[in-house]
Amino acid sequence: MAVRKSKVKIKTKATSETKAKRPTAKARKALKAASAKRTRSTDKPGALCTIGYEKALPGAVIGELTRAGVKLVVDVRAVAASRRPGFSKKQLAAGLDEAGIGYLHLQPLGTPEAGREAARAGKIDALIRIYDRHLQTKTAQESLGELAGLVKARKPLLALLCYCRNPNTCHRSRIVAALEERMPLAVDDLVPPPA
């Protein structure tokens, strides 16, 4: 199984809805050290995977999800459509269903159009700024709360799905960072074999 332990730790703006008080410097240092050692663990309050389908076939993505024990895919694309066969919403949901994996599309957690344009242009800093602003909207916060509830429940194990192969250049790393502000997480960034 191709699992890459992510070492991503990106700060997000805190709001009164997401965090009442900023952690001390000592707490931030401990959180940073813990996030650098991410691993799958059942003793943490939350565990999740992330996966991107760039350069992969649907069977490879589903196989990687199955090997990791994922039972629910949370699609965090703004537009759940793809020119790549098997990755549009209905096709993906059907393929996942055949493998015994559920599907949920949380469209409000998708990247707004301006962010997608920045990503296509390779302007990752702009993507992050745009997405961080978007993540503070009411609808995004509601969906983030729904996602946090699913992660806290710990069953089923879920995976955030988006297009980008590299989580470091994808908005799903920002979603993970926002979840980490709410709870400790064990995160696996799954990388399916390329086609």
Predicted regions and their residues:
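Residues lining hydrophobic/aromatic ligand-binding pockets adjacent to catalytic sites
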Residues: 2-195
